[in-house]
Amino acid sequence: MDEPTASLNDNDSDRLLTLLLELKAQGVTSIIISHKLNEISRVADSITIIRDGSSVDYLNCREEDVSEDRIIKAMVGRDMEDRYPPRMPNIGEILFEVKDWRVDHPNHAAREIIKGISINARKGEIVGIAGLMGSGRTELAMSIFGKSYGKNIRGNVSIHGKSIDVSTVRKAIDNGLAYVTEDRKGYGLLLEESIKKNTSLANLSGISNKLVVNDYRETHTANEFRSKLRIRSADVEQHTGNLSGGNQQKVVISKWLFTAPDVLILDEPTRGVDVGAKYEIYTIIDQVVQEGKCIIMISSEMPELLGMCDRIYVMNEGKIVGEFLAKDANQEAIMRSIMKNGENENE
């Protein structure tokens, strides 16, 4: 199984892992490919670690105590004392605000998917959105970004206190929004095109003269982002389909950073990415907010939200059901917010 829990919430992941252990007791052998170390440690009897196409370590979990730190060291080729880069937040005034945002289902107009959500983010702030699968996080992000999801969308979006038009993706981009999709292969990249072409895709005017693409400018821009984001490739002519998951994700982020957004919305930014590349992506995220921009981060990995965000909203069933400052947040408190709202809905 290749990344079997990548799109599952914690409860469903737990059920799948329990099923694997039950199958093991029945004599069934399972091979799991995963970046989630806690899951591998829970179910694996042995672990083979692959880096750059080669097997670099073999761990027998039945004969030795295997720690996550040891796995990480083998994966990245060095010790990693911290999973997240040190941050010195410099949070300013409100930069981005959404008020009373409502979205109906695209095929069932009577069904409201997003129910009067109001959120904001300040300059230099990373704001997380936590929630279970199906809570409406991705639908919220897509509906804000050019109304690319849903029908009968209403509410107000503002940047720097001024209402902006997000009625199309082009208008959303022109007004300072960018959205990194949760599905980079399906919607984030042209896999048969080069790093260069993908980097410039959302901002062709930035590398064109009178509607004609300037190849030198396009190549120069792609090389700048390749160097800045440490994209590992032969050159910028390499097809993105031949890159690792982490490097593909960096290309997607490059594409949107080239549009110079004020607000960067990241939907599952490290899904299917190894530990070393995750750290590099976290560093990129921190660099973006250090420039005075803000980031909205949607993630199913609570440790990621707790490790990177300054503030966390909690969503459930299309509503905001909780809000925490980083210093007050933990996994238990977030889950309590979700479960409490679920109980209220059922009463």
Language-model-detected regions and their locations in the chain:
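Glycine-rich phosphate-binding loops of nucleotide-dependent enzymes
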Residues: 1-347
